[in-house]
């Protein structure tokens, strides 16, 4: 039901867009509108020139800046700000030293056979937990 309502609204919007008032204006009236637009543009350009003459250059050149999408991906290593903060906090924790005594095992409650068969994720590979 929702899809049909959305398609009817979309079709209605397209139908109404075809009958805009500019389509019904006679050709002579359209030329007057173009003259009014040119006059408005020239007035606006004069206002800008009066406010800051250094910023207005001769001619009507436009500068379009296009950014490389790869540049945006590499910005902040491709991570959002909240993930960068979490990664920095994790790096601080990773740099701390963790000491274990030689006689200290992983857990005395886990039997040796079970400990050897347990698998832990190391990177992208499952390895026995005692190798970690």
UniProtKB/Swiss-Prot annotation:
This is Pro-MCH 2. Plays a role in skin pigmentation by antagonizing the action of melanotropin alpha. Induces melanin concentration within the melanophores. May participate in the control of the hypothalamo-pituitary adrenal gland axis by inhibiting the release of ACTH. Belongs to the melanin-concentrating hormone family. The keyword Transmembrane does not apply. Coiled coil: none annotated. One of its GO terms (molecular function) is type 1 melanin-concentrating hormone receptor binding. GO terms for biological process: chemical synaptic transmission; neuropeptide signaling pathway. The keyword Cell cycle does not apply. Disulfide bonds join 120-129. Keywords: Cleavage on pair of basic residues, Disulfide bond, Hormone, Neuropeptide, Signal. It holds the Pfam family Pro-MCH. Residues 1-24 form the signal peptide. One of its GO terms (cellular component) is synapse. Pituitary gland. Produced in neurons of lateral basal hypothalamus which project both to the brain and to the neural lobe of the pituitary gland from where MCH is released.
